[in-house]
C-alpha cells in the first residue's frame, strides 16, 4: 500500500533494491498502482520491508539534478528549451531546441559547475492551483494533475516528479561528453557525480594504454596518434610507388 521505490517516468528508470529477500529489478507505474518487478514471488497480503539500491538511486539523483542545473542555465543564458531527456546506464541525453556553439557549451558547463560548488539548496513542493498559475516554471508536458515543483535556488524552477539531491554540492560535478545537431537544435550527452567519476576513470585507463603503446606522455597522446597516421600514410604512398615501379 506504500513504497519508497520511484517508478520509471520522466526519462528516469525505476528504482531497484529488495523487498525482504526478493530483488526488485525495476519499478513501474500502472494506472494508480506502483508495480515492483522482482526476481521471485511474494505472498499477497503480507508485509515486506523494502530497501533501495541507494548507490544507484543517488547516482540517478545526481544526474537528474545536474540535468536541471544545465537546463535551467541553458534557458537563462541562451533561451533554450529542454525538449527531451533520457537517463541511460552510463550517460544522460538532453535535447535542446536551439543549436549551441562549442564556446557556448564551455560557458554552460563552467557556469553549471560553479553553481554546483556554491551548494545551493534544492527544494520540492506542491503549490496550490492559484500559486501554480502565477509561477514561471519549466515543463516538458501539459500537466493536468497535481504538480510538483523542484526549485534550484537562483537557477531553475521546473515541474518534476523525480527524486533530487537536497543541495547542488551533492551533484559533485557535471561534464558534457558529446554533442551533435538534432532536429534543428542540439543533443547533448552528459555525466554527473558518480557517473562522471566512472567516465573519467574509463577514459584515464584508455589514454594511459594509448600513450604507452605510442611511447608518449599522456598529454601528447593525440599528437602521437596523428604522427602514427602520417607515418602510415607515408608508408602507403611508398608501397604504391614501389608496386608501380615493379
Indicate residue ranges for each PLM-predicted region:
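Flexible glycine-/small-residue-rich
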Residues: 2, 52, 96-98, 151, ...
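Active/ligand-binding-proximal structured segments within catalytic/core domains
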Residues: 4-19, 43-94
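Ordered, soluble secondary-structure elements with a strong preference for glycine-centered loop motifs
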Residues: 7-11, 60-65, 102-106, 159, ...
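Extended active-site and interfacial segments that coordinate phosphate-rich ligands
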Residues: 11-21, 172-175, 205
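Solvent-exposed beta-strand/loop surfaces of large extracellular or lumenal domains
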Residues: 21-33
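A generic structural motif
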Residues: 31-40, 92-98
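Functional cores that coordinate and move charged inorganic groups
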Residues: 56, 79-182
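Terminal appendage regions of diverse proteins
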Residues: 171, 177-246
Amino acid at each position: 500500500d506504500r513504497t519508497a521505490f520511484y517508478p520509471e517516468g520522466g526519462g528516469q528508470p525505476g528504482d531497484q533494491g529488495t523487498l525482504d529477500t526478493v530483488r526488485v529489478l525495476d519499478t513501474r507505474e500502472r494506472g494508480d498502482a506502483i508495480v515492483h518487478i522482482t526476481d521471485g514471488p511474494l505472498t499477497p497480503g503480507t508485509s515486506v520491508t523494502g530497501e533501495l539500491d541507494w548507490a544507484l538511486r543517488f547516482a540517478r539523483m545526481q544526474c537528474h539534478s545536474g540535468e536541471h542545473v544545465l537546463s535551467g542555465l541553458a534557458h537563462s543564458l541562451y533561451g533554450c528549451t529542454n525538449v527531451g531527456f533520457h537517463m541511460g546506464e552510463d550517460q544522460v541525453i538532453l535535447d535542446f531546441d536551439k543549436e549551441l556553439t562549442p564556446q557556448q557549451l564551455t560557458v554552460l558547463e563552467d557556469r553549471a559547475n560553479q553553481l554546483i560548488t556554491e551548494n545551493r539548496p534544492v527544494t520540492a513542493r506542491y503549490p496550490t492551483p492559484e500559486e501554480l498559475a502565477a509561477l514561471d516554471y519549466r515543463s516538458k508536458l501539459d500537466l493536468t494533475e497535481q504538480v510538483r515543483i523542484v526549485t534550484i535556488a537562483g537557477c531553475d524552477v521546473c515541474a518534476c516528479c523525480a527524486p533530487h539531491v537536497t543541495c547542488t554540492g551533492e551533484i559533485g560535478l557535471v561534464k558534457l561528453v558529446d554533442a551533435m545537431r538534432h532536429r534543428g537544435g542540439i543533443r547533448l550527452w552528459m555525466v554527473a557525480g558518480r557517473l562522471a567519476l566512472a567516465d573519467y576513470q574509463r577514459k584515464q585507463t584508455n589514454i594511459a594504454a594509448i600513450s604507452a603503446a605510442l611511447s608518449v606522455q599522456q598529454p601528447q597522446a593525440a599528437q602521437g596518434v596523428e604522427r602514427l597516421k602520417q607515418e602510415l600514410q607515408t608508408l602507403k604512398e611508398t608501397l604504391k610507388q614501389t608496386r608501380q615501379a615493379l
